[in-house]
């Protein structure tokens, strides 16, 4: 289902109009309240700049953290407003609340081209409840709605879905449009062979993705802690590694489905095991059928990396979601980092490489190859749900393309 986008609105449509833009500024802060990664803020800049340069009054709305429906001082958007102001090279007005008389007055005083950031929308419980009156109050601040928050598009909240009942037009911003184009095309119309790399600790959190990808891809490479559930399902001893005992039958059925569909399903052949879950653990590499009792697998081994790289070599499209090991610990980050470098090499050869949100994004950034990927998704849960073939409420609520 194609949606109307910001590109369909000209400067004449936008000049002097109040445009409510849902952005995803849920960025990480350090202990001193300083932003440690401004990727999500930067990702929204093309939409903000286009609106501002077209003479619109730009009103940004975002959530930040989980304040549970009440104001929390450490979750105010002040550091975000400061960083955005630096990136835009102009002042950004931050309101003291997302709705109400104060916000209304500050928006009313806004001149064409100016940018206003509303205070954390989740300070109101009505946001996550998709309350109609709250949505109406947000909508009253604007004439036009733009959703550029892919990271929150899988939520039916007041600022992502409810407001669209009271504003028109409602369109996708540049970031949301790009996300949908890349992820949808990768699933619906990929250049083949298409490989999917799925990692992370639990099969349970990736069931939907694996099942959908088995219908779409030519090769499925599995890494991360979830591999041990597959091994145990095959009758192997996994030592003290993480296993979801209640998912053994599911693992067997996924392996059977891959075989039935002719999908090459690759599991690691060796793993790096540790005597404890810690950065300074004793570690060694063993074959998957030789994990010692009491030791736990925390990364894929060098033979597995080689095998994965060989499987990926001829692929024209690759989707990656989830790390190969516990990459927060340097000695167990080798597998994840090797896959990141391998994908950068594939991009250089003309393949389409898509990093589907979450920890995989942190991995390619840590290795310094983020700019060499075709597309890096800004949404964790949203990209997973899109890859699962689900309809995202924040997208469904937008106007259909003419």
UniProtKB/Swiss-Prot annotation:
Stated name of the protein: Phosphoglycerate kinase
E.C. number(s) listed in UniProt: 2.7.2.3
Key words, A-Z: ATP-binding, Cytoplasm, Glycolysis, Kinase, Nucleotide-binding, Transferase
Annotated catalysed reactions: (2R)-3-phosphoglycerate + ATP = (2R)-3-phospho-glyceroyl phosphate + ADP
Compartment list: Cytoplasm
Keyword set includes 4Fe-4S: no
Originating species: Synechococcus elongatus (strain ATCC 33912 / PCC 7942 / FACHB-805) (Anacystis nidulans R2)
Disulfide bond positions: none
Main location: cytoplasm
InterPro entries with a match to the protein in the record: Phosphoglycerate_kinase (IPR001576), Phosphoglycerate_kinase_CS (IPR015911), Phosphoglycerate_kinase_N (IPR015824), Phosphoglycerate_kinase_sf (IPR036043)
């Amino acid at each position: 289902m194609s949606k109307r986008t910001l590109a369909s609105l000209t400067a004449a449509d936008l000049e002097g109009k109040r445009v409510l833009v849902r952005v995803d500024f849920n960025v990480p802060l350090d202990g001193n309240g300083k932003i440690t990664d401004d990727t999500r803020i930067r990702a929204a800049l093309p939409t903000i700049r286009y609106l501002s340069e077209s003479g619109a009054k730009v009103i940004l709305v975002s959530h930040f953290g989980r304040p549970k429906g009440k104001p929390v001082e450490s979750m105010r958007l002040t550091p975000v407003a400061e960083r955005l102001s630096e990136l835009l090279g102009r002042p950004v007005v931050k309101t003291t609340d997302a709705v109400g008389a104060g916000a209304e007055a500050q928006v009313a005083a806004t001149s064409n081209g100016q940018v206003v950031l509303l205070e954390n929308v989740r300070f109101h419980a009505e946001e996550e409840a998709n309350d109609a009156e709250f949505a109406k109050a947000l909508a009253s601040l604007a004439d036009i709605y733009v959703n550029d928050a892919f990271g929150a598009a899988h939520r039916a909240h007041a600022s992502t879905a409810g407001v669209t009942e009271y504003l028109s037009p409602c369109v996708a911003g540049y970031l949301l449009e790009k996300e949908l184009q890349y992820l949808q095309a990768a699933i619906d119309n990929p250049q083949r062979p298409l490989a999917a790399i799925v990692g992370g600790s639990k099969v349970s959190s990736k069931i939907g993705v694996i099942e959908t990808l088995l219908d779409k891809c030519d090769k499925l490479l599995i890494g991360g802690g979830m591999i041990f559930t597959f091994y145990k399902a095959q009758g192997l001893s996994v030592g003290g590694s993480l296993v979801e005992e209640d998912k053994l039958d599911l693992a067997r059925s996924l392996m059977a489905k891959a075989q039935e569909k002719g999908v090459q399903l690759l599991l690691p052949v060796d793993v790096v095991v540790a005597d404890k879950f810690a950065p300074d653990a004793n570690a060694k590499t063993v074959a998957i059928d030789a994990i010692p009792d009491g030791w736990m697998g925390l990364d894929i081994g060098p033979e597995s990396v080689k095998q994965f790289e060989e499987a990926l070599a001829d692929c024209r499209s690759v989707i990656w979601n989830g790390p190969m090991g516990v990459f927060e610990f340097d000695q167990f980050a080798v597998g994840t980092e090797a896959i990141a470098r391998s994908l950068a090499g594939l991009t250089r050869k003309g393949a389409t490489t898509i990093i589907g949100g979450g920890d995989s994004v942190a991995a390619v950034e840590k290795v310094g190859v983020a700019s060499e990927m075709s597309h890096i998704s800004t949404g964790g849960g949203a990209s997973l749900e899109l890859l699962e073939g689900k309809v995202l409420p924040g997208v469904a609520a937008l106007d259909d393309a003419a």
